[in-house]
C-alpha cells in the first residue's frame, strides 16, 4: 500500500483505535439499517458501546488492509454483503471460528460449518418486469427466448457482487450453465452497471424485463411503481449479508454477543422490519414478500465461487464482449 493511500486512510482509522469495552463494527449495510442494528443490539446489551464504520465491501477490505499495514487494531466484527468475501478471509486465517448456539435455527447452507460466518438475511435475485410488458416470464430460461430478444437488462458481474454470485450459481447449474449466458448474449441482453440501473430501466419502460434483487422491486411495487416480480421456476440465487468475527478481535466476548443477537429471533425480526427476508427459519417474511419456507434457493458454493471468480469474470467479458 502506498504512503498516499495510508495517509488517506489513517485519519479515518485512528478514532477507531477504540478504548477497552467498546465493540468496533465494519458494515456495508445502508446507514439507516446499520444504525437500527446498532441501536437494537445496544438496547439488548446496554453495557456494550458500538462504534461503527459504514462503506462498500470493497472499500472496507481496502481500509482494513491499510490499517493492518499501519498497525491499527482491526474491527471486532464484520457485517458485509456476501459470503464469498468472507470465505476468502476465512481461508487466509483472518476470521475467528465461533459456534453460535443460534445456528440450529438456520439451514446449514447459510453458514460456515466451522463457524467463520453466518448469513443474516436473504436477498434473492429474480425477474422484474414492467406491468406494460407483453409476456410474463416464469423462468430464467424464458429470458433467453425469442420473445425477449433485446428486451432484458441485467447487472454486470464485473460491477455487482450479487450479479457475480448470480453468474456463479447459474453457470454451475446443470440445466443452465454457460450455454445459458451465451444464449442471453445472443439474445441482445444488456449487461451493465448494478441493480439500481436495472430497476431504473425497467420502471421507466426502457427495458420491459430485468434481473434484479427482490427488495428493490417489491418495495417499489408497494409504493406504486409499475413493476412486478417473479421468483423463477428453477430457483433463486441469493446474497446473505453475513456476520463474522475477526481472528484478532480485541473484544471477542462482545463480538460473540453481537453474532448471537443478529441471529436471534429478535435480530431476525429486525431484519423483517427493515424489509428483508429473514435467514432464520420460523420467522415470517415482510408483508408482500413470499414466506421464507416457500423459497427455492439454488445450490451455491462460496468456496468454489471464490476460486472461480477471475475466470468467471474473464469468460463473461468474452461472452458479452465487454470489459
Where are these regions (language model features)?
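Short, polar/charged alpha-helical segment
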Residues: 24, 28-51, 65, 220
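A ligand-binding cleft/hinge motif common to bilobed small-molecule-binding domains
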Residues: 84-88, 208-226, 275
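Periplasmic-binding protein-like
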Residues: 123-124, 181-185, 191-192, 223-249, ...
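Extracytoplasmic ligand-binding site segments that recognize negatively charged/polar headgroups
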Residues: 28-35, 57-58, 73-206
Amino acid at each position: 500500500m502506498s504512503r498516499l493511500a495510508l495517509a488517506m486512510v489513517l485519519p479515518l482509522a485512528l478514532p477507531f483505535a477504540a478504548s477497552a469495552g467498546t465493540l468496533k463494527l465494519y458494515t456495508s449495510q445502508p446507514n439507516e439499517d446499520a444504525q437500527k442494528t446498532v441501536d437494537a443490539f445496544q438496547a439488548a446489551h446496554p453495557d456494550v458501546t458500538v462504534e461503527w464504520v459504514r462503506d462498500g465491501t470493497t472499500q472496507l477490505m481496502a481500509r482494513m488492509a491499510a490499517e493492518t499495514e499501519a498497525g491499527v487494531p482491526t474491527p471486532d466484527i464484520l457485517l458485509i454483503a456476501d459470503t464469498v468475501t468472507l470465505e476468502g478471509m476465512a481461508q487466509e486465517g483472518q476470521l475467528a471460528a465461533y459456534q453460535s448456539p443460534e445456528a440450529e435455527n438456520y439451514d446449514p447452507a447459510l453458514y460456515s460449518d466451522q463457524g467463520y460466518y453466518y448469513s443474516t438475511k436473504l436477498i434473492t435475485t429474480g425477474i422484474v418486469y414492467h406491468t406494460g410488458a407483453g409476456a410474463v416470464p416464469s423462468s430464467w430460461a424464458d429470458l433467453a427466448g425469442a420473445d425477449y430478444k433485446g428486451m432484458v437488462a441485467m447487472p454486470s458481474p464485473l460491477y455487482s457482487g450479487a450479479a457475480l454470485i448470480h453468474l456463479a450459481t447459474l453457470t454451475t447449474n446443470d440445466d443452465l450453465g454457460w450455454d445459458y449466458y451465451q444464449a442471453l448474449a445472443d439474445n441482445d441482453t444488456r449487461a451493465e452497471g448494478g441493480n439500481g440501473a436495472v430497476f431504473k430501466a425497467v420502471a421507466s419502460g426502457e427495458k420491459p424485463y430485468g434481473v434484479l434483487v427482490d427488495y428493490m422491486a417489491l418495495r417499489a411495487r408497494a409504493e406504486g411503481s409499475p413493476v412486478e416480480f417473479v421468483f423463477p421456476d428453477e430457483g433463486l440465487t441469493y446474497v446473505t449479508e453475513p456476520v463474522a468475527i475477526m481472528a484478532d478481535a480485541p473484544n471477542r466476548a462482545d463480538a460473540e454477543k453481537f453474532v448471537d443477537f443478529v441471529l436471534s429471533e429478535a435480530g431476525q425480526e429486525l431484519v423483517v422490519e427493515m424489509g428483508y427476508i429473514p435467514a432464520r427459519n420460523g420467522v415470517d417474511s415482510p408483508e408482500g414478500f413470499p414466506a421464507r419456507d416457500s423459497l427455492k434457493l439454488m445450490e451455491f458454493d462460496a468456496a468454489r465461487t471464490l476460486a472461480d471468480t477471475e475466470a468467471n469474470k474473464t469468460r463473461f467479458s468474452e461472452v458479452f464482449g465487454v470489459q
